[in-house]
Amino acid sequence: MSEFDAQRVAERIDIVLDILVADDYHSAIHNLEILKAELLRQVAESTPDIPKAPWEI
């Protein structure tokens, strides 16, 4: 995802819910992990470099 789009995130969450209804927990978890990584990467790209606390290294 190139920019945060609440509608797109909602659609992807809906897909994960459909996968859960189908009892495919492994795929649902995998899809959530991918979505989380994409969102975290996007936030990291859009925020200035802030020094990390020692426990975040």
UniProtKB/Swiss-Prot annotation:
It comes from the Bacteria. Pfam families: YciZ. Belongs to the UPF0509 family. This is UPF0509 protein YciZ. It comes from Escherichia coli O157:H7.
